[in-house]
Design a protein with these regions (language model features):
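Mid-length scaffold segments of soluble, non-membrane domains
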Residues: 73-122
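Second-shell loop/turn segments in exported
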Residues: 72-80, 139-145, 158-160
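C-terminal partner/receptor-binding element of secreted or periplasmic proteins
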Residues: 148-179
């Protein structure tokens, strides 16, 4: 009888630990080697900024930013059904309550959304998702510590004023220029 109880407990723990729920992180890992996708990371070093000239607010925003993960699907004549399938998967993942949507705009054929993971002033991840029926889609995960919406707006202003190191964006540029 004790053996049955122990086995039942172990089996229950095993089932609980096997989370079949797909996250964006799992999706990125699964698709990173798929020929229809391009995947790369962007570090804070992409922003060539003189940190001595940054305001205190800009320094805090930059410190909260760890990296960006980019995953893009470029549509072509042979992968249109894959595009539809993958777009549905991403939409399904983003509907999970873990991802809180800040903004959504566009139509059924194309659009974009901004979501986040975490609490209002302790955001761990911002997700930018955009799709266009005749081009494909891209997902950008902005990862950091204790970010907030103001940090993102400040980072965008830093990006505008920085000399961006385009070498880190070369994989995306190569994909866009491929025919």
């Amino acid at each position: 009888m004790k053996i049955i109880i122990k086995l039942s407990i172990i089996f229950s723990l095993f089932l609980i630990s096997c989370n079949s729920e797909t996250s964006l992180q799992k999706y990125f890992v699964e698709k990173s080697e798929n020929k229809n996708f391009i995947s790369f990371d962007v570090s804070p070093s992409i922003l060539n900024v003189d940190k001595t000239k940054l305001s205190e607010e800009q320094k805090i925003a930059l410190k909260s930013f760890d990296k960006m993960n980019v995953l893009a699907f470029k549509i072509n004549a042979t992968n249109q059904s894959d595009f539809s399938t993958e777009k549905l998967k991403v939409n399904s993942i983003l509907k999970n309550e873990k991802y809180q949507q800040l903004m959504k705009f566009g139509s059924g054929k194309e659009g974009a959304s901004i979501s986040y993971v975490g609490e209002d002033d302790h955001i761990n991840e911002f997700i930018l998702y955009g799709n266009k029926k005749d081009a494909g889609f891209a997902i950008v995960r902005i990862l950091g510590k204790d970010m907030n919406p103001n940090n993102i707006m400040t980072l965008i202003s830093i990006m505008k004023d920085s000399k961006i190191n385009l070498d880190q964006l070369k994989p995306l540029q190569d994909m866009i220029l491929k025919k």
